[in-house]
């Protein structure tokens, strides 16, 4: 309880039994990063609903896991059954080469001399795109997208910063 509000926090899947109007914040699992000079994983998608009537009913809560690394894998979706039409989409994977993962927020592209890859796209209303990798000898990977901003592009020797989160 905080300031008269009851807070239910789920770090794994379970059941929610509310009795009134609630504010919901649903976050999906983040994407995994790639190896070497690869890009960073994107943040899990974020859905916020500040005034949702829930009534007296059981809801199944699914908490998405983060994506594995080396190679990067997309994060898993999070949802509350019967409340929202869309799930919070898992974050996109960062890549060493090829296309960065799309997701709640996109993964960062890999840096390579043979052609850096673009960052992955984010899901509208949930997150932002990842940054591109840098084309240079030992070019660095891009930062993963965040819920509040796009990931930065990689530089000659340093990876791009991840996108900012939301307050």
Task: Give residue spans per PLM region.
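Glycine-biased low-complexity/repetitive sequence motifs
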Residues: 1-167
